[in-house]
UniProtKB/Swiss-Prot annotation:
Belongs to the eukaryotic ribosomal protein eL24 family. One of its GO terms (cellular component) is cytosolic large ribosomal subunit. It holds the Pfam family Ribosomal_L24e. This is Large ribosomal subunit protein eL24. Residues 96-122 have a biased composition (Basic and acidic residues). Gene3D superfamilies: 6.10.250.1270, Ribosomal protein L24e. GO terms for molecular function: mRNA binding; structural constituent of ribosome. The gene is RPL24. It comes from Branchiostoma belcheri (Amphioxus).
Amino acid sequence: MKIELCLYSGYKIYPGHGKRYARTDGRVYTFLNAKCEASFLMKRNPREITWTVLYRRKHKKGQQEEIQKKRSRRTAKFQRAITGASLTEIMAKRNQKPEVRKAQREQAVKAAKEKKKADQVGKRKAPAKARATAPKTKAPKTVKAAAPRVGGKR
């Protein structure tokens, strides 16, 4: 299957489509349709006709590759203080030995677990008192009656 290109528009011409125009000097032109042929015979410049491929190339339409060429800024590493911790504190923590850091972490975890346990014990005592004071009763739900249908076929 041979696919040709329209001389005027630049679009592909599939077999069974298009039109050939032979001039008296022997040159043969292939056109996609009568519109392209008529424009060619009127000596219209395809670079100025908006729907042609030549116009789209000239005016850089529909080219995603161009967008990718734009360079993105490189991220630069920058050290600065964070809220609640100065840069010197951060650097001191970073330069600590792993054993010291591990011991601190374990100590912090232990303290958090103890606090959680104490909170749970406090929570267990409070709900027991609340249950004994007032048993709940369920209120019956009011069911809304369906409105009568008015007019119409259905």
